[in-house]
């Protein structure tokens, strides 16, 4: 038996996790945020159950502020791959006019993402939800298990996690409780890009460098994606060569100057990167420990 490469080991672990959840939970779902990690997750899920389709639906929590290219890519992938796509919007948040400009990143994220996700999980009664979080992304995620227990209110208690020795997972939950499952926990950002290159996985074009209209605000390059973008007095819009390392709501996601226009260029760029991909996410700057607080409340 030949020795597995690093990427093959990561792939095998993720596929094992997918199959374990399918075998032990009655109503799982995959959270599909449309980013690079979600694209890798989709690819792995298709592999795990081939030639059958994944035995669970894909859930996208739409904040109504995602990049337009993300929504176009999401719908195109659903048509091409033929998976069941569920889209949920917190309609009460829409009626209340919640948005990143009017209410700030913290309130917007809580109402439109966290509360929206909890609504969808309750509506469809999912008992397990796959997510694309990785331990190298952020310190609160670094201490989270692959199988992350959530109580009936979808809350996470980092001091009450289940042991995962020898790849043996405790999948038992009581009524109303659930598990968030992270098959990519042991992957790094570089692993993700090398796997995307190796497998030729389709991704949102925003990850590739192109000239885009951006404004420099609070140390971030924010792309002007539609006419809802509120410019400050004297704030110029510049067409700059940029790409995104991470994707989310466009007013809360910063681009980076880059000329990496293909996958090989991105991998080369990642080999010398010395900053976190989440430096471009405004939601991580809300307050100290903000990500852990969000996760305790039921965030992805």
Curated annotation (Swiss-Prot):
Residues 281-300 are annotated as: Disordered. CDD domains: Sulfate_adenylyltransferase_2. It comes from the Bacteria. Keywords: ATP-binding, Nucleotide-binding, Nucleotidyltransferase, Transferase. Heterodimer composed of CysD, the smaller subunit, and CysN. With CysN forms the ATP sulfurylase (ATPS) that catalyzes the adenylation of sulfate producing adenosine 5'-phosphosulfate (APS) and diphosphate, the first enzymatic step in sulfur assimilation pathway. APS synthesis involves the formation of a high-energy phosphoric-sulfuric acid anhydride bond driven by GTP hydrolysis by CysN coupled to ATP hydrolysis by CysD. This is Sulfate adenylyltransferase subunit 2.
